[in-house]
Curated annotation (Swiss-Prot):
Annotated organism of origin: Corynebacterium urealyticum (strain ATCC 43042 / DSM 7109)
High-level lineage: Bacteria, Bacillati, Actinomycetota, Actinomycetes, Mycobacteriales
Gene Ontology biological-process entries: DNA repair; DNA replication
HAMAP family xref list: DNA_ligase_A
Catalytic residues (positions): K131
Catalysed reactions, as listed in the record: NAD(+) + (deoxyribonucleotide)n-3'-hydroxyl + 5'-phospho-(deoxyribonucleotide)m = (deoxyribonucleotide)n+m + AMP + beta-nicotinamide D-nucleotide
Cited PROSITE patterns: BRCT, DNA_LIGASE_N1
Domain of life: Bacteria
Name this polypeptide is given: DNA ligase
GO cellular component: cytosol
Residues that, per the record, bind Zn(2+): C426, C429, C445, C451
GO molecular function terms noted in the UniProt entry: DNA ligase (NAD+) activity; metal ion binding
Biased segments, Low complexity type: 1-22
Domain BRCT per the UniProt entry, residue ranges: 624-712
Amino acid sequence: MSTQYDSDSSPAASNSGSADPALAELAQQWQSLADQVRHHREVYYYGNPEISDAEFDALLTRLQEFENSHPEAVTGPSPTTEVAPSPPESSPFRNVDHQEPMLSLDNVFDTEQLSSWLDRTPAKTYLTELKIDGASINLLYRNGVLELALTRGDGTTGEDITHNARTLSDIPARLQPSEDFPVPEIVEIRGEVFIRVEDFAKMNAQRQAEGQKMFANPRNAAAGAMRQKDPAETARRPLRLICHGIGAREGFTPASQHAAYEALAAWGLPVSPYTKQVHSAKEVLEQVAYWADHRHDADHEMDGLVIKVDDTESQQRLGTTSRAPRWAIAYKYPPEEARTRLHDIRLGIGRTGRATPYAVMEPKYVAGSTVTMATLHNPSEAHRKGVRLGDEIMIRKAGEVIPEVLGPVEDARNGAEREFLFSSLCPECGTPLAPARGDDADWRCPNTRYCPGQLHTRLTYIAGRGAFDIDALGEKAAYDLIHSGVLPDETGLFSLTEEDLRRTDAYTTKSGALNKQGETLLTTLAAAKEVDLWRVIVALSIRHVGPTAAKALANHYGSIPDVAAADVETMSTVDGVGPIIAESVRDWFAVSWHQEIVDAWAAAGVRMEQDVTEQPSADAAGSIQADLLAGLSIVVTGTLEDFDRSSAKEAIESRGGKATGSVSKKTDYLVAGAKAGSKLTKAEELGIPVLDEAGFHKLLSEGPGKGDAEED
């Protein structure tokens, strides 16, 4: 299917066997790169990509750089000057020319490149809009009636998919008349067909239930749907349209891109709600930064931000190249999804004994970092996704979120892939794994005290900034303390001596003397004995008890023995605790070896008490409920006096709310501290209630309607 150009007919090729073997070698390198670009561009446009978007972008950039360095090696038409592959002769669809070429966009990949483009392309007003990851379409309306729907094709000629396009509810058969924008005699409308993220998940779930193959991503599903021979199959997919441009037109000349979008909306066509006019290069860069942090606020997948000169006269003056307008550019974000190969599946054991399967993969750059492992969540989920050893798989990593495996690329299988069988034994200690409850999807290791895997994660948690904040006790050092036999559990942590540390590799020199890291550990352990009581409570690793609940318990009871002696009913009334946390505290202290930890730390000098700063009141009973904020989506931004990011999140979630990182129409409250920034601006634009820190405290204690910011 891939278009091939005959390099043997070119001048460079005809001379390759004679005068200049070096030039012939360069020409062969160019031809190989050009063929790869054409092949991958073609399979992408027809919904069957073999590499990720980022890998294709890198391949195209490599070809462009090669041509810039060796122009003499270019032996024929280059894909760097082409929009897309021509429709194949074997296509079941009729090939039709566009009224006006349907060009692509040039890309930039960092703010330095974007700033350079902005310097070359100054404008009073720019338009920024999301780059939708879908399938391009060109709609031709004559006297307001839909006449043709074409794919982009090679930019000059596309495939006639009119019958399929008519099944989309977003594509009107007739444009609505408008007093402000009369319907022109002829107009080409360019847009993107896509599937919303929410609809894609529902569609794939239904396909799985029906035993059908699931789609790898919304873009492939949308592109494939538009090229179905049977329009009824197209109609079964939840396709949507966003219009983002106008091609040929007669009787209509908009003054700006923004005015063109107003006309499209007036005619009954969908336009993006995420488009924004900005008036400087600085504002463009601010939009780029904003959407880098808010990619998931949109209801569709997006892989970049498109920047356009708004003024139509300026667009005409700037003109186009053979493949793209000079007045527009696409800023491409680092990919959040990537394709790689699965080498192995292993089990990791967490702090609470949970066994989490994770994939070991070929290294892949995704969302700004190179990843080699990705979670499969639990054995049931791993089986559901159907991954096999040796599979090519799709992975996703959004920002700082742990990478996850989306599923296998089934079309890439060659029969050499192998089923993976999960061991029923803990990989760390050999204890049989079992669900904590009959309906629990997670497997757990019941050897809580002595399992090296659980102890390792508990030690690093104890040493973390949210607990004792112990320097020189990182993951490698914790591993060494455990596997050298120095610490069979956390009981002896505060009794460690120089002699103990000399039995480890992490804390000794080659001669066996205590090294600087060992000295630092002993110093910080001594200092940690005097930390605030709430940090000690956090370090006990009680389920559901983070900094917020720990502070509430410390302030209310004043000592670890009093916390241990409290009954669930009374503890449930403590502001910031509630019944779920109270039951978890009771269950933790009911385990005999947990009390041994408390006793050993106390004997070693860890402070186990403080002054009581809050007394229970009769009115407190039932005031804090686990569902106080149920159903509410809350965003915290800026700097707060009484909360860091994790404790604010815990305070919301312990009351049944959802703590999210970005503002959208679904956000119920924004809590704004100092230096709140763009999230505050967006919340105000959307009319979302904004709370200061005092209002946040009221919301946490009294629920919605009581902690709202007062109106002027």
